[in-house]
Amino acid sequence: MSIFIGGAWPYANGSLHLGHIASLLPGDILARYYRAKGENVLYVSGSDCNGTPIAIRAKQEGVTAKEIANKYHEEFQRCFRDLGFTYDCYTRTDSEHHHETVQKVFLRLLEEGYIYKKTVEQAYCKTCTQFLPDRYVEGICPHCHEAARGDQCDACSAILDPLDLLEKTCKLCGSTPSVEETEHFYFALHTFQQQIKKVVEIAKEKGTWRDNAIQLTERYVKEGLQDRVVSRDLPIGVPIPVKGYEDKKIYVWIEAVAGYYSASKYWAEETGKDDHEFWNSDAQTYYVHGKDNIPFHSIIWPAVLLGIGEEAIPRHIVSNEYLTVEKRKLSTSKNWAVWVPDILERYNPDSIRYFLTVNAPENRDTDFSWREFIYSHNSELLGAYGNFVNRTLKFIEKYYDGIVPQGTINVELKDKVEGLYKNVGEAIEQTTFKVALETIFDAVRFANKYFDERQPWKEREDNPVSCEETIYNCIYLIANFANLLEPFLPFSSERVRSTLSIVNRNWEPQNTLPNRIDSVQPLFERIDVKQIEHEIEKLYGAAK
């Protein structure tokens, strides 16, 4: 089976925060799981280096957009690597390959009659002497009356045109823009009304899209899909490949989602492999992003794929809700965020991955609390999982000189482990990652109870053979926990595998166990709870 996983492309205009990771982490869990199952996986993403936010930040800082994009693209790569993300291809939208691929998509849509020219009115800033596309305009959303950008309202997820906004201002200088005529290209989205309606009906029937994606897409379909502008007067981006219009750029909402396609093609060129199997109707496709990106993946991207004749319509949409911070809405402008480069300096990446999975905003907004983060590490990772691994391995090191005693696998434990692979695998495939991880940790708590009830420290004196059986079965559980937890906690799983000399990484029970163990070290260190107050003070102190 061919599995295509696309992670949303973060704007390269500022550091990643935990809200980004909360929405993107499911992609890596899926990729690791399907690879362990032996499936053919292509997991792609990249940095959005063409967006309006980058141009705005560059102008504000007096540097080039390329300098801003380079800085954050490199930082993103480091952060994703340090968090254990396993992209098969992580690229950027300002690459020559991406530009060429997107231009081919644009021309194909133009040739098929899905793109047309139209004279329209657009916001124009007389102070800055330029037309103002999407995010260059700010104001009030006409639907919910919250503050919004010219492309979208984060409060109600409405897709907007800058002229829709009330109380419009220029993002660059703050003046009120005028309205002038200009010519642009439009995407005939209305022609895909019935096809998109069918796509969402199937997703609803099969339960393969998150509820928020189904509800929002149904709303747009019910209102009637509206044609969308696909060109903009921007300083950076992919030039329109039509003579006389080279100064205009392809609008980021169509260009960025086409990044999945360009990354796939780039991967194929670099590896010499064929990517066609990821774009046919048999492919299982997963698109992983936050709820603010839903319409781009549930309406626009399917329509583009239909327009260019590709069959791999988004099968699964994994659209998480928002992550708040200490009960307040995350805000980059107010510096109310937990920044990824910062948290990685002090905390175990598996601790971050664990918390953002068990506390994931899968169906509702959830909160990142420093207190809950540190207590979850100490009680679950250290107190439950780390404790079971450490007490078992230390027992072997102390009483058996590192030689794993031999025995037979308990039938009840074997059935439990086999059931875990089935149940956890199903939960991952159904994108209920919190359920999957909690299921494993229920088994970890069962394992600690098993150790306590068997009392090997007493068995060693009273019944040495029974003690060997107990420890052998504990090693069996540890080996399988490392396997089951690898999609979620890759770093600690690798350490356990190394200690047990386990090579097999398949998604199946580990029945061949090691003869000896080496270099037993604690899997996790306790975090001083005094850090809670320190981190909260730091957060409030940095807020604007």
UniProtKB/Swiss-Prot annotation:
UniProt binding sites for Zn(2+): 141, 144, 153, 156
Keyword Transferase applies: no
Co-factor binding details: Binds 1 zinc ion per subunit.
Residues the record lists as binding ATP: 332
EC class: ligase
Alphabetized InterPro entries for the sequence: aa-tRNA-synth_I_CS (IPR001412), Anticodon_Met (IPR041872), M/V/L/I-tRNA-synth_anticd-bd (IPR013155), Met-tRNA_ligase_1 (IPR023458), Met-tRNA_synth (IPR014758), Methionyl/Leucyl_tRNA_Synth (IPR015413), MetRS_core (IPR033911), MetRS_Zn (IPR029038)
Motif ('KMSKS' region): 329-333
GO cellular component labels: cytosol
Classification via PROSITE patterns: AA_TRNA_LIGASE_I (PS00178)
Motif ('HIGH' region): 10-20
GO MF entries: ATP binding; metal ion binding; methionine-tRNA ligase activity
Domain of life, source organism: Bacteria
Known role: Is required not only for elongation of protein synthesis but also for the initiation of all mRNA translation through initiator tRNA(fMet) aminoacylation.
Family: Belongs to the class-I aminoacyl-tRNA synthetase family. MetG type 1 subfamily.
Subunit text: Monomer.
Protein name: Methionine--tRNA ligase
